[in-house]
Amino acid sequence: MEEIRAWRHVFKLDPNKPIDDERLERLCESGTDAVIVGGTDGVTIDNVLDLLARIRRFSVPCALEVTDVEALTPGFDVYLVPIVLNSRQAEWIIGRHHEAVKQYGDMMNWDEIAAEGYCILNPECKAAKLTRADTELDVDDIVAYARLAEHLYKLPIFYLEYSGVYGDPSVVEKVKQALDQTQLFYGGGITTPEQAEHMARYADTVVVGNAIYDAFEQALATVAAVKQMAGQRNGDDGK
């Protein structure tokens, strides 16, 4: 999906967390490339629909990260489907996906759906515990998952998810070096524009989530930081 390939900065909103109208407006008009709606727990059709309706007052592209098929609804520009590559349970790799397609496959517009190959690396986060992710990985393990995502499974997105803690930029750099066509998303622990800029040196797309609720002004400042670094990278590529 070409529109996703253009994303450099993305905000992720949790439908189970409150955000007032004034902050939502500032976030949607901040210059971010997209807003992803998604969370690990407490995601319902009601809170997803409520957040979607509020975001739709603005022109920013809006994606739903599908973690619970019961909260699936029309109206989003893109549907992102996580495949947790380092999960110890098959349901997070293929099981839930099979069940969703079994129920709704006839109605799916596959042009609006993109799979994300997740590698969850924070053992304390809700997502790691829920999916029983094997987080005891060295950099070679992580790079191997990235290569599997691109070359074996042909996934359009590889998502390094540190969820709540700031990751190791050297790991992100090595993963980026291993990828050619697959787009590298990074999410986790970004609370300052400096951190966002650092990760944007390597990741194709930087996702900012928790800072929206914990450090809102800093979260907004990450947009310009990421865009500036993305511009520098594009300039370097053009030399």
UniProtKB/Swiss-Prot annotation:
Its EC number is 2.5.1.n9. The keyword Magnesium applies. It catalyses: sn-glycerol 1-phosphate + all-trans-heptaprenyl diphosphate = 3-heptaprenyl-sn-glycero-1-phosphate + diphosphate. It is an enzyme of class 2 (transferase). Sn-glycerol 1-phosphate binds at K12, Y159, L160, E161, Y162, S163, G164, G189, G209, N210. Its cofactor is Mg(2+). Pathway: Membrane lipid metabolism; glycerophospholipid metabolism. Keywords: Lipid biosynthesis, Lipid metabolism, Magnesium, Metal-binding, Phospholipid biosynthesis, Phospholipid metabolism, Transferase. Pfam families: PcrB (PF01884). One of its GO terms (molecular function) is heptaprenylglyceryl phosphate synthase activity. GO terms for biological process: glycerophospholipid biosynthetic process. It comes from the Bacteria. Mg(2+) binds at D14, T40. Homodimer. PANTHER family: HEPTAPRENYLGLYCERYL PHOSPHATE SYNTHASE (PTHR40029:SF2), PTHR40029. Prenyltransferase that catalyzes in vivo the transfer of the heptaprenyl moiety of heptaprenyl pyrophosphate (HepPP; 35 carbon atoms) to the C3 hydroxyl of sn-glycerol-1-phosphate (G1P), producing heptaprenylglyceryl phosphate (HepGP). This reaction is an ether-bond-formation step in the biosynthesis of archaea-type G1P-based membrane lipids found in Bacillales. To a much lesser extent, is also able to use geranylgeranyl diphosphate (GGPP; C20) as the prenyl donor. Belongs to the GGGP/HepGP synthase family. Group I subfamily. This is Heptaprenylglyceryl phosphate synthase. It comes from Geobacillus kaustophilus (strain HTA426).
